[in-house]
């Protein structure tokens, strides 16, 4: 939970969400403030991903409301990821940024190198549809890390990543302390390394704890 002395970048009030007759969230009220690192845990099917999607604005709640500051920018990595059928890595990850702009940005080059193996034309001009599942996942993650956001929602960000890249990702996120991060992951090491708060989704409620997973 955000400190009473901190202003929430994003919050939900009395949010409920169900699929069919099955309630996943019941009257949940939470807030996310600048720089918080929150891990979302719970049993499979408890509603962890649903909570992230509702907070990110990807799904509407059945009742209650989600609010964010007028200038707050949100990024989201979901478990699936989508892109235009013929989009290239370049267009999907870098958008319409001029090459001289991103190529001169050491942070962008680091992300492209760590996740995509480099930023040469033959690498960036590959189609997303031609990539393996793991390569697509890394491309979607690179897109979110390159964006300038205030709150970043990550749903199973370590899926399809090897241990070296997971370690790089943890260090990268720790090196960007101004971004608030809310992540669902089964990777206990990642939770302990990155997160300082836990939200446990249990029976439609969200219980909050200070500290990492362990």
Which residues make up each language-model segment?
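ABC ATP-binding cassette signature C-motif
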Residues: 1-214
């Amino acid at each position: 939970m955000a400190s009473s002395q901190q202003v929430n970048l994003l919050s939900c009030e009395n949010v409920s969400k169900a699929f069919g007759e099955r309630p996943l969230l019941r009257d949940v009220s939470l807030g996310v403030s600048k720089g918080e690192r929150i891990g979302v845990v719970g049993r499979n099917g408890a509603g962890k991903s649903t909570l992230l999607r509702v907070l990110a604005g990807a799904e509407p709640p059945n009742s209650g409301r989600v609010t964010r500051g007028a200038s707050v920018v949100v990024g989201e990595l979901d478990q699936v990821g989508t892109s235009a059928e013929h989009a290239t890595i370049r267009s999907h990850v870098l958008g319409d940024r001029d090459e001289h702009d991103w190529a001169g940005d050491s942070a962008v080059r680091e992300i492209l190198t760590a996740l995509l193996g480099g930023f040469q034309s033959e690498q960036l001009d590959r189609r997303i549809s031609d990539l393996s599942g793991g390569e697509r996942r890394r491309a979607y993650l690179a897109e979110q890390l390159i964006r300038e956001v205030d709150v970043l929602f990550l749903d199973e960000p370590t899926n399809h990543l090897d241990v070296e890249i997971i370690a790089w990702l943890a260090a990268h996120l720790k090196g960007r302390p101004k971004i608030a991060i809310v992540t669902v992951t089964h990777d206990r090491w990642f939770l302990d390394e990155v997160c300082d708060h836990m939200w446990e989704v249990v029976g439609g409620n969200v219980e909050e704890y200070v500290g990492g997973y362990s």
